[in-house]
């Protein structure tokens, strides 16, 4: 379509999922790029993930390598094919429409509509309505395997199905193991899966049939956890168990002869990615018989009580073992490899089209809503100003701050709204949070930001309620580390209401003993956030001239905070007297924009009100400073000798 960027394929989904769905998408992206297809990636916010997740590392690597472009949901694009992944992503309609004009639309069904007991996993009728409304036309559902297709065939109200199953894709080469026969004198049985009780048999007796408690076997398990001890009790002596992700699955599978996979009766395996990984490695897959429709001659099929005999027979016959391993590897290469994916794309949309980009519609302005707490200083506000200053076009920062220093934001050229904190108003905190919720809901409706960033130590309940009322709004909590040890468990639990948690690194983080240290897996740690870069600082002579400091005297700066929560007057006056009497120093005192009381200074001592003060730090020979995050890192960046006051 004229005026719209064109892509052969647009992939739509929530690509934060840590499991097989995202791995399958990454394989498709790599195969499409290698075949010359141009792919756009449209990230949606699904309802499944309940705590912060980053984009799956393999998908992020694809984006960084240029295998796909990350699309702005507000930008209209045209495509030959939309491939939407996982029904759960379409549980709710978003606040804004997806602007993709596609010729063909598929919804890949990575999760079955029913569990093994016939109970619904999701409302497929509502999801189908939402998917067609969001994607702008007819959507065909593409099961990833025959188990899912069979469930839909039995439904009276099934959505329209694509004619062929959309199998997962794997590049076999990284998984291949040069096998000359079984690894040891004893058969090595293994399995890897995420730590979920549904991925294991229903009871202990069945589990020990498939994974014998018998010293004539070695059993290796990648993906153990408390659930497994609840199932089997103490691990048998012949079991070797590692936590999920303790090692790459490629390395694990190289230590396994037989990949034995039996799961719970409630679980319906839509595809079985771990199975094709095992077969690609040359391990012999031993599976329940319901997998035969998908994997055919690539695996051995047995009931749990038949596993022991099956494994012992193949282990004793080296040639039969190798033949079966080769059958599995050949099936993977033929049916699930990148070439198979490219063949189905060519059958569906033809070869890549030569038109790369449309006429190029201008990118729409997008507003990012920054929310900052009040604080006793202006650190929260300054950190978000540092981020806002670096936002690329067409992003437009908008602020809601509880800080009385709101004028600073406006002086920096940004839109800013001010809402007084409940302590400043003398009102009930519960009523104030209700007001905050309504204010935020109105601001979100008015500015329509795709992202809200909160900087503060404690996410307010009113903020949490506003986020819950806007489930497709992406939310980020920017929080410092260095919490007091043993404190904050109730606060850190609120991270589940954010899509991402960003922690600006503290240069003293080796001494961090606070609770955030134990939540790093859910946190994106970034370099220290500072308002100015090194090149923005004035050279010493220019800074002294700007502040009116005598170039021939020692210059000292005192910045002990706003003084709103601690009275620094006694300390300040003692320091001034000592510096002037003993060292004949030219003393300056930083005056905070939100100070409730004006500074009372002796004659000849100047108040410095410039913002940002860090621009002038090189004017001083010494800084005596409170140990706030911003002050600490700005002084270190400036390279000025300092004494920090706890």
Sequence positions of predicted segments:
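Conserved nucleotide-sugar phosphate-binding/catalytic loop shared by glycosyltransferases and other
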Residues: 45-75, 238-241, 365-366, 371-375, ...
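A charged, aromatic-enriched C-terminal amphipathic alpha-helix characteristic of glycosyltransferases
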Residues: 305, 315-354
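A short, active-site helix/loop in glycosyltransferases that binds the activated sugar's phosphate group
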Residues: 93, 116-163, 170, 499-521
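Conserved catalytic-core segment of nucleotide-activated headgroup transferases in glycan assembly
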Residues: 24, 125, 143-252, 387, ...
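Extended catalytic core of nucleotide-activated donor transferases of GT-like folds
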Residues: 10-12, 23, 27-31, 37-136, ...
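Nucleotide-sugar-dependent
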Residues: 199, 260-276, 288-297, 625-630, ...
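A nucleotide-sugar donor-handling region in carbohydrate enzymes
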Residues: 161-174, 479-480, 484-487, 494-564
């Amino acid at each position: 379509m004229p005026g719209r960027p064109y892509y052969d394929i647009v992939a739509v989904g929530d690509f934060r999922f840590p499991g097989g769905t995202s791995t399958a998408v990454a394989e498709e992206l790599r195969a499409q790029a290698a075949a010359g297809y141009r792919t756009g990636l449209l990230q949606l916010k699904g309802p499944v993930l309940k705590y912060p997740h980053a984009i799956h590392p393999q998908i992020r690597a694809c984006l960084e390598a240029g295998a796909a472009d990350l699309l702005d949901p507000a930008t209209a694009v045209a495509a030959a094919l939309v491939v939407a992944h996982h029904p759960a992503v379409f549980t709710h309609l978003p606040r804004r429409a997806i602007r993709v004009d596609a010729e063909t639309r598929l919804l890949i069904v990575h999760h079955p509509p029913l569990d093994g007991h016939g109970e619904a996993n999701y409302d497929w009728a509502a999801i189908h309505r939402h998917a067609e409304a969001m994607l702008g036309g007819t959507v065909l559902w593409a099961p990833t395997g025959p188990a899912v297709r069979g469930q839909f065939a039995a439904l009276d109200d099934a959505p329209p199905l694509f004619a062929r199953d959309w199998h997962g894709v794997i590049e076999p080469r990284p998984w291949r193991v040069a096998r000359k026969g079984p690894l040891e004198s004893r058969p090595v049985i293994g399995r890897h899966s995420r730590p979920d009780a549904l991925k294991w048999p229903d009871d202990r007796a069945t589990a020990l049939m498939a994974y014998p408690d018998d010293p004539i076997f070695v059993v290796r398990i990648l993906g153990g956890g408390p659930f497994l001890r609840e199932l089997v009790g103490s691990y048998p002596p012949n079991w070797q168990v590692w936590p999920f992700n303790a090692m790459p699955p490629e390395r694990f599978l190289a230590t396994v002869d037989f990949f034995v996979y039996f799961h719970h009766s409630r679980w319906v395996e839509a595809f079985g990615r771990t199975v094709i990984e095992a077969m690609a490695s040359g391990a012999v897959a031993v599976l329940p018989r319901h997998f035969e429709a998908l994997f055919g001659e690539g695996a051995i099929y047995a009931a749990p009580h038949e596993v022991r005999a099956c494994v012992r027979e193949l282990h004793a016959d080296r040639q039969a073992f190798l033949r079966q391993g080769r059958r599995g590897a050949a099936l993977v290469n033929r049916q699930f490899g990148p070439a198979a994916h490219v063949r189905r794309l060519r059958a569906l949309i033809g070869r890549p089209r030569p038109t790369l980009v449309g006429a190029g519609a201008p990118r729409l302005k997008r507003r990012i809503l920054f929310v900052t707490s009040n604080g006793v200083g202006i650190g929260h506000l300054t950190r978000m100003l540092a981020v806002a200053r670096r936002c690329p076009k067409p992003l437009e920062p908008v602020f809601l701050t509880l800080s009385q220093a709101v004028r600073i934001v406006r002086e920096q050229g940004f839109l800013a709204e001010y809402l007084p904190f409940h302590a400043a108003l003398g009102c009930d905190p519960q009523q104030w949070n209700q007001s905050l919720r309504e204010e935020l809901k109105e601001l979100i409706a008015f500015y329509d930001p795709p992202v809200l960033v909160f900087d503060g130590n404690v996410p307010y309940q009113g903020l949490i309620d506003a986020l819950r009322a806007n489930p497709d709004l992406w939310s980020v909590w920017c929080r410092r580390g260095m919490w007091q040890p043993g404190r904050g468990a109730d606060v850190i639990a609120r991270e589940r209401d954010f899509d991402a948690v960003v922690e600006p690194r503290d240069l003293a983080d080796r001494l961090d003993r606070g609770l955030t240290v134990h939540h790093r897996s859910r946190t994106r740690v970034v370099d220290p956030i500072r308002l100015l870069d090194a090149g923005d600082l004035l050279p010493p002579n220019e800074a002294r001239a700007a502040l009116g400091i005598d170039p021939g005297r020692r210059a000292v700066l005192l910045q002990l905070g706003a003084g709103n929560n601690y009275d620094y007057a006694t300390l300040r006056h003692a320091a001034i007297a000592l510096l002037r009497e003993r060292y004949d120093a030219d003393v300056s005192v930083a005056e905070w924009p939100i100070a409730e009381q004006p500074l009372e200074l002796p004659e000849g001592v100047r108040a410095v009100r410039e913002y940002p003060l860090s621009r002038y730090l090189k004017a001083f020979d010494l800084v005596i400073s409170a140990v706030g995050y911003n002050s600490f890192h700005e002084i270190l960046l400036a390279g000025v000798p300092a004494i920090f006051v706890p």
